[in-house]
């Protein structure tokens, strides 16, 4: 009997499968497509990651923990997945995104630099900005390699005795009180 079935081996599913297997649970991952496919949302070269969050303070502990988990994954997988390049949020100084990013950086002692449009265009020559835009550059930000992350999570999940069935579409599931039946 399985402890957990994880449906979908994309970014979230593969990470969940890995962490459950690492805790010693008997887990199965189900993916309706091949291991390599272009049907998910994790494909491409990069996904943004940042510590200064304009969405609100409640997310900061999650962001801090995610940085720790990415570094742990890199160490265990022995490849770089997280690239710390810094990140800039650009907007009008009165915009909620700009103000919230700046307030988050100040409140949580994050390393940041406020920049006007000329400073931004000098540092990042690819930008051509109107005069009313400014930026908050945060050192604690960058990008992830999402495809490598999924590969690392699935390979390490298997190393921790998880099972993964590819090309197995879930048709339905039914709660039987004592267990859940999954029909594929």
Question: What positions do the PLM features span?
Answer:
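Helix C-cap/helix->beta junction micro-motif
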Residues: 23-25, 77, 108, 160
């Amino acid at each position: 009997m399985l402890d957990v079935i994880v449906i979908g081996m994309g970014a979230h599913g593969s990470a969940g499968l890995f962490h459950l297997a690492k805790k010693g649970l008997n887990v199965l991952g189900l993916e309706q497509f091949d291991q390599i496919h272009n049907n998910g949302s994790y494909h491409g070269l990069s996904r943004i990651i940042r510590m200064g969050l304009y969405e609100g303070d409640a997310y900061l502990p999650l962001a801090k923990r995610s940085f720790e988990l990415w570094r742990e994954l890199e160490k265990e997988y022995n490849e770089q997945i997280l690239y710390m390049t810094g990140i800039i949020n650009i907007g009008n100084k009165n915009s909620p995104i700009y103000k919230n990013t700046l307030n988050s950086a100040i409140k949580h002692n994050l390393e940041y630099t406020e920049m006007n449009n000329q400073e931004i265009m000098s540092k990042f020559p690819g930008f051509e900005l109107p005069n009313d835009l400014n930026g908050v550059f945060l050192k604690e930000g960058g990008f992830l390699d999402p495809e490598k992350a999924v590969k690392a999570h699935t390979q390490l999940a298997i190393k921790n005795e998880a099972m993964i069935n590819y090309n197995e579409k879930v048709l339905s599931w039914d709660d039987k009180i004592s267990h859940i039946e999954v029909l594929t």
